[in-house]
C-alpha cells in the first residue's frame, strides 16, 4: 500500500515539474499584470467628478449672548445633472436649511439655490452658478438587471468621496421603509450610509442608473445589512425637468386603490375609492373593473398610475369599466395630486 502511495506521489511531482518547465511563468508573480486585475476604476473616473458633497447649514445660537451662526445641520451628496449647474439630491438632505453649500470634487465650493423639491420621491433640485461642469453619462437603452454590478458614490459621514460596490438585488421595489408615494426603487447591497443620500448609483460602465436614497437598517433602527435603495434615473429625470420647468412636480390625481384582476379577462379591480376624489365624482365604485383608460387596454397598475400622473389637471379621460357584466364608459376629470 505504501509502495503505491510512493509511486503516486512520484508521478504527481513529475507532472508538476513538467508543467512548471513548460509554463515557467506560473511560478512568477508577473503572471498577473495590471491589466488582469478586475477593476471598476474607469467607471468611477467617468462618474465621480459629477458627484458633489451637499451641506445643509442652519442658524443656531450656543447661548443668549452669542450671535446666530450657520452650522452644518445635515449632510449628503448630490449629482450634477446639467453642465450649467442643476443638481439632484434628496429632499431630506436639504430640508429646513437656511443655507445650502455644494462642494465639487475639484475643490470649488458654491452656495446653492433650491429650485424645488418633491415629497413623493424625496428629490430636490439645486442650482449653482457654474458652467462646463462634468455630468454622468446615461443610457436609456440599457435596462437595469438583477445581478448587475452597482457602485454607490457619495460622501458617507463626511469622510470625503467614497465608492462602495455591490450588485442590483432587485428592481421595482415598493412599500420600502417609511417612504411614501409611487415607489419603484432599485435595491442594492452597495453600502448607502448617512451622507450617501442624493449620491450616484452607477453601473460598471460608469452610467448613472439611480439616485441613492435610503437604507432600511439605518432608517428603521433594525439590524439589517445590504438593504439599500435608489430612485431609478428615469423617475429622477422626470422630476428634475418638471421642477426646472414648473418649480414643483404637478401630477394628475384619480383617487382609487386597486389590484390586478385574477380572472382570465384581466383588467384592474377597484378595491377602494377615496371620498370626493375624481373617481368618486365620476361614479366609480368598489368592485368595478377598469378595462381601458383613454382607449389603452391591458394596462398594469403601474402603467395606469403613470398615465394618470402624467395627465394635466382638469383634463377629461375616458375610463372604461366592467360592472355586473355591463361595459360602461365613464368620463373622469383628473385633478392635481395633493402631494402634501
Label each region the model flagged.
Residues 1-4:
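Positively charged n-region of N-terminal signal peptides that target proteins for export
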Residues 103-104, 292, 322:
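A general beta-strand register signal
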Residues 80-81, 321-325:
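Short hydrophobic alpha-helical segments used for membrane anchoring or interfacial signaling
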Residues 315-317, 328:
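Exposed beta-strand face motif in extracellular beta-rich ectodomains
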Residues 109, 327-329:
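A structural signal for beta-strand boundary/capping segments at domain termini and interdomain linkers
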Residues 87-88, 279-301:
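Conserved PDZ fold ligand-binding element
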Residues 6-12, 21-266, 274-275, 301-305, ...:
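Serine-dependent protease modules
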Amino acid at each position: 500500500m505504501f509502495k503505491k502511495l510512493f509511486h503516486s506521489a512520484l508521478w504527481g511531482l513529475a507532472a508538476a515539474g513538467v508543467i512548471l518547465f513548460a509554463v515557467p511563468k506560473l511560478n512568477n508573480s508577473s503572471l498577473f499584470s495590471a491589466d488582469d486585475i478586475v477593476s471598476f476604476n474607469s467607471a468611477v473616473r467617468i462618474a465621480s467628478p459629477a458627484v458633489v458633497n451637499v451641506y445643509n447649514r442652519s442658524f443656531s445660537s450656543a447661548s443668549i449672548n452669542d450671535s446666530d451662526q450657520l452650522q452644518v445641520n445635515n449632510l449628503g451628496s448630490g449629482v450634477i445633472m446639467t453642465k450649467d449647474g442643476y443638481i439632484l439630491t434628496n429632499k431630506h438632505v436639504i430640508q429646513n436649511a437656511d443655507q445650502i453649500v455644494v462642494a465639487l470634487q475639484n475643490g470649488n465650493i458654491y452656495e446653492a439655490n433650491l429650485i424645488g423639491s418633491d415629497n413623493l420621491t424625496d428629490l430636490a433640485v439645486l442650482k449653482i452658478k457654474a458652467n462646463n461642469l462634468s455630468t454622468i453619462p446615461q443610457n436609456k437603452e440599457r435596462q437595469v438587471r438583477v445581478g448587475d454590478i452597482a457602485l454607490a458614490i457619495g460622501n458617507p459621514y463626511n469622510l470625503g468621496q467614497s465608492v462602495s460596490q455591490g450588485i442590483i438585488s432587485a428592481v421595482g421595489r415598493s412599500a420600502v421603509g417609511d417612504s411614501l408615494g409611487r415607489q419603484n426603487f432599485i435595491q442594492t447591497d452597495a453600502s448607502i450610509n448617512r451622507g450617501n443620500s442624493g449620491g450616484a448609483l452607477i453601473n460598471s460602465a460608469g452610467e448613472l442608473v439611480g439616485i441613492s436614497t435610503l437604507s432600511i437598517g439605518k432608517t428603521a433602527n433594525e439590524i439589517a445589512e445590504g438593504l439599500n435603495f435608489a430612485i431609478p434615473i428615469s423617475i429622477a429625470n422626470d422630476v428634475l425637468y418638471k421642477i426646472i420647468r414648473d418649480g414643483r412636480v404637478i401630477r394628475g390625481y384619480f383617487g382609487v386603490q386597486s389590484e390586478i384582476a385574477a380572472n382570465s379577462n384581466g383588467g384592474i379591480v377597484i378595491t377602494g375609492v377615496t371620498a370626493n376624489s375624481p373617481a368618486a365624482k365620476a361614479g366609480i365604485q368598489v368592485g368595478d373593473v377598469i378595462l381601458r383608460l383613454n382607449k389603452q387596454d391591458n394596462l398594469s397598475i403601474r402603467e395606469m398610475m403613470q398615465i394618470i400622473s402624467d395627465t394635466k389637471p382638469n383634463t377629461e379621460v375616458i375610463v372604461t369599466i366592467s360592472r355586473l357584466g355591463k361595459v360602461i364608459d365613464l368620463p373622469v376629470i383628473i385633478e392635481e395630486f395633493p402631494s402634501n
